[in-house]
Amino acid sequence: MDAEDLSSARRALAAAARRSGDVLGALPAPGGRSPEQRATAAAAKDTARALRCRFMDVHAEAVYDELTDGRTRHLRLAELAEAAAGAFPGLVPTADQLAAERLRPQAGKEGHEIDQGIFFSRVLRAPVAGPHLLASMLRPTPRALRLLPEFLRTGSADLGSVRLQRTGGVARLTMCRDDCLNAEDDRQVDDMETAVDLALLDPAVRVGLLRGGEMTHPRYRGRRVFSAGINLKALHVGGISLVDFLLRRELGYIHKLLRGVLAADHACWHSPAIEKPWVAVVDGFAIGGGAQLLLVFDQVLAAADAYLSLPAADEGIIPGAANFRLTRRAGPRLSRQVILTGRRIQASEPDARLLVDQIAESEELDAVTERCLARLQSPAVVANRRMQIFAEETPEEFLRYMAEFSLQQALRLYSDDVVAKAGRFHAKKQAARNPDGG
């Protein structure tokens, strides 16, 4: 495909986007449209999106090469989307469009992030661009690099929703969103990736530990909780983004937990990534995204009264890469029960042993954790975990999954049932906070 063909296709794409924008601009805001107006808007967007798909099916590699200067620049997801908005008008939403969307509740948005889903689905499935983007997302974040010298000096970092402490060769990451039971939003994803980067980049760290902190919620006051999953309140008010939460979470810190970090100054001919073993300790519960996390840890410990669940069918969204990994860990039957029917797995039941390595009473869990951390500091652990991961999950398989996930999750994010469920959750929380309607 020559430059003239790409230039012609670029002009056609921009023209189609303008036509779609003209139709939408003549209508009321999304929340105030009649059924007929919603149908008109949907038809205009569908026409433009079909052209975006065809454009990226043909030109994904050329587009990516232009945006990254022939793959000499390592752009992260948000940077790549921003560059695409400027270089290829109409391909993805502009910064102004996204800023306007962020001011609206989920039910009142136009759904421009679906166009980002189209873009990333095609980039990730491209044979050359996909692996390059995957590697770019394994590089340390600029925030982590800024904080690294101080962390190396003090062994401590308070990132807001995550606290990081280095003691005895262990990087201890504590999730401390006590206001929402460690439910994740864009902010926590950024904090988590920064913490994971710091732990991996510190040569004094030999193993990482992730655990939830003590809560202030009346029901769990003074007790540790691992994670309540996605923050549904943030979803309702439009605070969960496709790129900075749903895609960055999977391609960023979760993938780094599995494969390590690619540091530019890590000159090692036999291992370009800095990899370390990881332990997760589940107190209370690991719901949704919390349960997804466990699938990439080398050892999972849990309190005897803890439970795991992936209520994807109830929430209406796709549970990250759990559809990809859970079947490999627990088999197709249990995977379908957990994801499709919302089955809750108690740590004490036999099926939990497919997901949890060791169960302990709450008062014994600290001691069990320390023994596990000591075992994983053996010099041979890193090489053996690398070979196990190589056998269990190839980057090519993960890319294929994430390419499809990018689009399907974007569609789910703006589906009527997800918007309605998030709204009901928010209303329930508001009613509980103001029982007299005040």
Spans of features found by a protein language model:
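C-terminal alpha-helix plus adjacent terminal tail
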Residues: M1-G168, Q346, R375-G438
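Glycine-rich beta-to-alpha active-site loop
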Residues: K45, R49, A78-A107, Y253-E315
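Short, aliphatic-rich beta-strand segments
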Residues: G169-R177
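Hydrophobic alpha-helical segments that mediate membrane insertion or helix-helix packing
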Residues: L173, M192, L210, L293-L294, ...
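A structural preference for short, pocket-lining loop segments at secondary-structure junctions
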Residues: L173-T174, D191-G260, H266-I274, V279, ...
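A generic structural signal for short coil/turn motifs at secondary-structure boundaries
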Residues: C180-E184, E396
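Crotonase-fold acyl-CoA enzyme core
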Residues: A267-P379
